[in-house]
Amino acid sequence: MKAFMQRAYGPPDSLTFEDVPDPVPAEGEVLVRVHATSVNPYDWHFLRGEPYVARLMTGGFGLRRPPAGVLGCDLAGRVVTAGTRFAPGDDVYALLPRGAHAEYVCVPEDLLAPMPANLSHDQAAAMPMAAVTALLALRGVEAGRRVLVNGASGGVGTFAVQLAKALGAHVDAVCSAANADLARSLGAGEVFDYRADDFTRSGRRYDVVLDVAGRRSVFACRRVLERDGTFVAVGGPAGRWVQPAGHVFLAAAGGPLARRRVVLADAVACRDKAAVLGELARWAERGAVTPVVDRTYPFDDLRAAFAYSEAGHAKGKVVVTLGVPGRSA
């Protein structure tokens, strides 16, 4: 099969497009033909080995050079070999630790979920990492609550706006002026231009501030957070992947944030990924959530997809299709 192999840390051009042996499923796994995948910040942090903690997460053996392997955590495809829960021909999607940037991948059955019935493989591939993160970030949000999504036009943000609206919350958004119409179309009310408006001095108050962009300090954000509100840290600018954990540490240390709840939304650490994907499939099938796909790249152009994603200007998700005939929306 064809796969993009990582054999060194570096830019997208460091990935090598190779012929590698077809994987053989172990007990509890099924073989899946990958129809589409995507690129996430999680992927390009491991590609570059930046920040350095990403290298420690390879198991401690990749400080100077990563273990040879395949990146990619978002998967939408079709089952090839039978398991106990899935049969050949079943359309599935999953959030993997890695391995989706290949034609085939062996997946533990307990990570797989049936694809949303109304979505194509390309659309479904946009969901796992971003949509799971967004849904985890909004746990506990009830109808009538006020939610602010900072970074509303990216992968996580576009799902967060839709999900918060579907949960009955009032949603405001922070993004560029160029993406304001997109945010409104997804359900946002007030939209702040991050270049021109200081949303932290808007005078508004929110029950939840979901920070995807990571360009304002948690102490500035507390100005718009209710005293019993929740600050949810998701991401930060390139090279500052550990920033969300820093927010949680500062809150735990006490001070002005001590009365407020600060949490970290981490899809990778989620223990019931398949169940969450099943929940998201139901939201999608009801029409409450639709993936926003900015660009779709052919598989052999994966390096360009990495470069575009890393530039940080994508509206929604960057999807990579493997050119296999599959389900259309």
Each PLM stretch: what is its role?
Residues A281, R286-R295, R303-A329:
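C-terminal capping/lid region of NAD(P)-dependent oxidoreductase domains
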Residues F61-A76, D91-G151:
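NAD(P)H dinucleotide-binding glycine-rich loop of Rossmann-like/cofactor-binding domains
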Residues V212, R216-A288, G323-A329:
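Glycine-rich phosphate-binding loop and adjacent beta-alpha segment
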Residues R201-V208:
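A short acidic, Gly/Pro-enriched loop at the edge of an enzyme's catalytic core
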